[in-house]
């Protein structure tokens, strides 16, 4: 899988004039990579993900998946949203099978595929439960299983853990690292949480705000990354390298905010 974003721009036109949400975005994601795009509010993170998902149309520029131009939603891109997007009247299994049913898969194929991915996310014993019976973290694991069940080439994640408490979020990070390494899937996740980006990603794109542009691209190399599988647990947050990357990204974001504040004041 190769995701290529070239000279991407998105301008919104309203009664009060034009707003440039994204300007000259160039990014790429290779097969099996975990990439994060981090930025503050107003950096166009969610707009970027919606464009890649085919839920919005760029003003100019191109998005290609394996050389095919994105012109709308497709099964080659899975999406996990920040807010729980499960159907409350369906069981966990039915939620995971939903996309497969739309694709015309047989009942046996739906059952087997859903069982596999529910096992991957550690929820096989909750197959017949309803979303109301699950915690927030469990709901997001179901959403991840549902997206993965359709075998997307890239999994798009829109701040999926933003509504979770810190302890649940940390557990979800380790679940996600394990899922990514077991399935060797490609993931693009957007977040405003700097430590989340450094902990999860192999590469991080730092976005500025108003308009959203790429300030910098960083390759993350933490102790244990040379191992197979990568040994990323929460002990890694004590390492000097983790602080270095987090501080560099935070400084970039703070620097941009300072420039904007000074511009408004003048």
From Swiss-Prot:
InterPro entries: AAA+_ATPase (IPR003593), ABC_transporter-like_ATP-bd (IPR003439), ABC_transporter-like_CS (IPR017871), ABC_transporter_ATP-bind (IPR050166), P-loop_NTPase (IPR027417). Keywords: ATP-binding, Cell inner membrane, Cell membrane, Ion transport, Membrane, Nitrate assimilation, Nucleotide-binding, Translocase, Transport. It is an enzyme of class 7 (translocase). It comes from the Bacteria. ATP binds at residues 39-46. It is a peripheral membrane protein. GO terms for biological process: nitrate assimilation. Its EC number is 7.3.2.4. It catalyses: nitrate(out) + ATP + H2O = nitrate(in) + ADP + phosphate + H(+). Pfam families: ABC_tran (PF00005). SUPFAM superfamilies: P-loop containing nucleoside triphosphate hydrolases. Residues 3-234 form the ABC transporter domain. One of its GO terms (cellular component) is plasma membrane. One of its GO terms (molecular function) is ATP binding. It is found in: Cell inner membrane. Belongs to the ABC transporter superfamily. Nitrate/nitrite/cyanate uptake transporter (NitT) (TC 3.A.1.16) family. Part of the ABC transporter complex NrtABCD involved in nitrate uptake. The complex is probably also involved in nitrite transport. Probably responsible for energy coupling to the transport system. The complex is composed of two ATP-binding proteins (NrtC and NrtD), two transmembrane proteins (NrtB) and a solute-binding protein (NrtA). This is Nitrate import ATP-binding protein NrtD. It comes from Synechocystis sp. (strain ATCC 27184 / PCC 6803 / Kazusa). The gene is nrtD.
């Amino acid at each position: 899988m190769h995701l290529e974003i070239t000279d991407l721009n998105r301008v919104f036109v309203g009664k009060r004039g034009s707003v440039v949400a994204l300007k000259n975005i160039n990014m790429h994601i290779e097969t099996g990579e975990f990439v994060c795009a981090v930025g503050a509010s107003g950096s166009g993170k969610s707009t970027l993900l919606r464009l890649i998902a085919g839920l919005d149309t760029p003003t100019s520029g191109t998005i290609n998946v394996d050389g095919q131009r994105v012109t709308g939603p497709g099964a080659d891109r899975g999406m996990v949203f920040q807010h729980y997007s499960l159907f409350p009247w369906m069981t966990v299994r039915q939620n995971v099978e939903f996309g497969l049913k739309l694709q015309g898969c047989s009942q046996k194929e739906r059952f087997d595929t859903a069982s596999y991915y529910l096992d991957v996310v550690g929820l096989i014993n909750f197959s017949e439960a309803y979303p109301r019976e699950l915690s927030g973290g469990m709901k997001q694991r179901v959403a991840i299983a549902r997206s993965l069940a359709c075998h997307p080439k890239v999994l798009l994640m829109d701040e999926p853990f933003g509504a979770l408490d810190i302890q649940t979020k940390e557990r979800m990070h380790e679940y996600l690292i394990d899922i990514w390494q077991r399935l060797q899937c490609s993931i693009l996740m957007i977040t405003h949480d700097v430590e989340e980006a450094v902990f999860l990603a192999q590469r991080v794109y730092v976005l500025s705000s108003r308009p959203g542009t790429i300030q910098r691209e960083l390759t993350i190399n933490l102790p244990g990354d040379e191992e197979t599988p990568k040994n990323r647990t929460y002990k890694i947050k004590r390492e000097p390298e983790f602080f270095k990357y987090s501080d560099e990204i935070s400084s970039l974001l703070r620097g941009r905010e300072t420039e904007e504040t000074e511009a408004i004041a003048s």
